[in-house]
Amino acid sequence: MPFAIHELHNAYRAYRQFQDSNPPLHHARYIFPFFRGSYFAYRKVDVLRTVVIAKAISVNPSYVDIGCGYGDFLDKVRQLLPDARGIEKHGSIFYAFQISKPDYINLMSAEDLSESVDVAFVGWMEPGQDFRRFVAKCAKCVVTTFDTGGQCGISSGCEYEEFGFQRVAWWRTPSWIDVNGQLMNRYYTPSLDLGKKEQLAKLRTAHNFWYVYAKPELTARIESGLQWWLKKLEDPNDRFDFESVLD
């Protein structure tokens, strides 16, 4: 997260002003994702699938979230994998706002990874950076997500086949930016009529893509675990409360 401290403070002031306006529930999460959410859109189904993948590898899997920020996605994973950990390169995001850093988040970069882990989750890679080879050295499986308009969606460069991994699965999650037009309606002018909303819904193109890469010896186990989950247990009605903003 390559921000100067003064930029963070300016953003935080804008965030506080927005909160003082008593906005609709969960809107701050998507308008100010740095402070209240994550840089990528996710739903409960994404968390559950990630956990299923980890448990297909081991009964007690090791898991690291690389570039976890304040740990929004990581905290959801930890509800099911209590030993999951995160790493964050920029400690200033905690110190600048006197936010207590959880013990399960270590201040380090992906280049400093040394311990082997069952699953590495990569939800953010700064523009121009490429730390995949460091992740590949330590992880047995990599789950990564990126949006269609980001550096990975446009230019690729987020695949792991060149490091000896095989792509096991992929899916997509509708992203917020073109799902709920009101989120980008800064002054909350009157809502669009139903007909206009239906027209806009047909134009939805922004998505977060999720890709799963694994060492060849693990692909069959992960595929089997995911297929079992999809057929037997996945419930489309099992959602986080903030998902109401996405639909």
Regions found by a protein language model. Name each.
Residues D118-D130:
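A short SAM/SAH-binding and catalytic strip from SAM-dependent methyltransferases
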Residues P61, D118-V119, K140:
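Conserved acidic residues
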Residues D72-Y104:
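Class I SAM-dependent methyltransferase SAM/SAH-binding core
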Residues M1-I57:
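S-adenosyl-L-methionine
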Residues P127-A214:
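C-terminal substrate-binding/active-site "lid" region of AdoMet-derived donor-dependent transferases
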Residues A54, N106-E115:
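Short amphipathic alpha-helix with an adjacent loop that forms part of the alpha/beta core around
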Residues N60-G69:
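Conserved class I S-adenosyl-L-methionine
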Residues P190-D247:
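Core SAM-dependent methyltransferase catalytic element
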